[in-house]
Curated annotation (Swiss-Prot):
Keyword Signal: no
Database matches in Gene3D superfamilies: Alpha-D-Glucose-1,6-Bisphosphate, subunit A, domain 3, Alpha-D-phosphohexomutase, C-terminal domain
GO cellular component entries: cytosol
Sequence similarity: Belongs to the phosphohexose mutase family.
The protein's name in its UniProt record: Phosphoglucosamine mutase
Active site, per annotation: S102 (phosphoserine intermediate)
Cofactors: Mg(2+)
Function: Catalyzes the conversion of glucosamine-6-phosphate to glucosamine-1-phosphate.
Cofactor: binding comment: Binds 1 Mg(2+) ion per subunit.
Organism of origin: Sodalis glossinidius (strain morsitans)
GO terms under biological process: carbohydrate metabolic process; peptidoglycan biosynthetic process; UDP-N-acetylglucosamine biosynthetic process
PROSITE patterns, per database record: PGM_PMM (PS00710)
Enzyme Commission number: 5.4.2.10
Keywords: Isomerase, Magnesium, Metal-binding, Phosphoprotein
């Protein structure tokens, strides 16, 4: 494990105005990244953002830092994170930068990088950037300063790319879909993709104002989507998170379909078509029901650490093409290089159309075991998981489950949260046991 000062599991993230998400730091980050990336030849960086109000400030700071290092910035405006990975590849840019805090509230923001291949930066490159950050900022000669430009057709390019992952012999004609874009980066992309493929689209969360991103909408809160699907008598609902790398769905009965179920549907369809090479990667948080359902299909399944970068690492290690987190990060390496909510959703839609089945029936081969996740916020630098009382509470729960469930306690990689997950056969028992551990974590925090 590398010991980064600034880079977390998903780039650099925090509250805007607090270190490190300040204009002066982000300017220097742009300069430091520019110094490292300039060693590799190309002088162009693609920069995209989600819809947070702070994105304007931070992209200006990045531009100044990159220019001082002699690199040019090409801006896309609000675009999904996976779109920047795609555009970085197609423009042969040295790197892509996304200004986003994904599913976090609007007052947070972050910076994450993509390599020339459209994948997250290797640890050694992040370490090299951190080493440059420790040095005093310098500026290249005026004749070598970087320039700024805008990619005017970025959205159109990405829309066509997404549509190209949907089978050319199929159409969404006759399907009514409610789409919730979380007032985030997919708001002007996802509805167009679905309409151009033939669907009737009802939109939610497509009016960003800079401060309503992820606010009681999108993949992290599907209650509004569930009620709208029922009210519209729609065939299904699709929700993305603020930066578009996650997808959660809702069937025609208003029931939530999470990342585990989406992974199951896609894997089963790949298997049916003879296109599943190897197995499937989930995480420690993946529901036991997914593992059991894949076992019935004869599909190998392994778990990685939580975090889409670790899912990808495990996929690359095994040589497999499909992986996902239950939160809705779905990685399909035969389609793209990173988690992409729009593209993952399209693969589920193609399974629906190709099998003449609704989403509810497609998911029926997998039974989710009751799983309760409780997030406990903590303050300070101490680790509540090191507490003897927390360990005792966890051991007590393990004993009560008696081998017929799972307990997982972990720190969030992006927020000051302890995630308490308990899984078992009985919903009431699982909820009670999860809150028993959560109470111990709160007391320790």
């Amino acid at each position: 494990m590398s010991n980064h000062q600034y880079f977390g599991t998903d780039g650099i993230r925090g509250r805007v105005g607090d270190s490190p998400i300040t204009p002066d730091f982000v300017l220097k980050l742009g300069w430091a990244a520019g110094k490292v990336l300039a060693r590799h030849g190309s002088r162009k960086i693609i920069i995209g953002k989600d819809t947070r109000i702070s994105g304007y400030m931070l992209e200006s700071a990045l531009e100044a830092g990159l220019a001082a290092a002699g690199l040019s910035a090409a801006f896309t405006g609000p675009m999904p994170t996976p779109a920047i990975a795609y555009l970085t590849r197609t423009f042969r840019a040295e790197a892509g930068i996304v200004i986003s805090a994904s599913h976090n509230p609007f007052y947070d923001n972050g910076i994450k990088f993509f390599s020339i291949d459209g994948t997250k930066l290797p640890d050694e490159v992040e370490e090299a950037i951190e080493a440059e950050l420790a040095k005093p900022l310098t500026c290249v000669e005026s004749v070598e300063l970087g320039k700024a430009s805008r990619i005017v057709d970025a959205a159109g390019r990405y829309i066509e790319f997404c549509k190209g992952t949907f089978p050319g012999n199929l159409s969404l004609k006759g399907l009514k879909i409610v789409v919730d874009c979380a007032n985030g980066a997919t708001y002007h992309i996802a509805p167009s993709v679905l309409r151009e493929l033939g669907a009737t689209v009802v939109t939610l969360g497509c009016q960003p104002d800079g401060m309503n991103i992820n606010q009681e909408c999108g993949a992290t809160d599907v209650r509004l989507l569930q009620s709208r699907v029922l009210a519209e008598k729609a065939d299904l609902g699709i929700a993305y998170d603020g930066d578009g790398d996650r997808v959660i769905m809702v069937d025609h009965l208003g029931q939530k379909v999470n990342g585990d179920q989406i992974l199951y549907v896609i894997a089963r369809e790949k298997l049916r078509q003879g296109q599943l090479s190897g197995g499937v990667v989930g995480t420690l948080m993946s529901n036991m029901g997914l593992e059991l359902a894949l076992k019935q299909l004869g599909v190998p399944f392994v778990r990685s650490r939580v975090g889409d970068r670790y899912v990808l690492e495990k996929m690359q290690e095994k040589g497999w093409r499909i992986g996902a987190e239950n939160s809705g990060h779905v990685i399909l390496l035969d389609k793209t290089t990173t988690g992409d909510g729009i593209i993952a959703g399209l693969q589920v839609l193609s399974a629906m159309v190709g099998n003449h089945m609704n989403l509810h029936d497609l998911c029926s081969g997998m039974r989710l075991l009751p799983q309760i996740l409780v997030n406990v916020r903590f303050a300070g630098q101490h680790d509540p998981l090191a507490s003897a009382a927390v360990k005792q509470a966890s051991d007590e729960v393990e004993q009560q489950l008696a081998g017929r469930g799972r307990v997982l306690l972990r720190k969030s990689g992006t927020e000051p949260l302890i995630r308490v997950m308990v899984e078992g056969e009985d919903t009431e028992q699982v909820s009670r046991l999860a809150h028993h551990i959560a109470d111990a974590v709160k007391a320790a925090g």
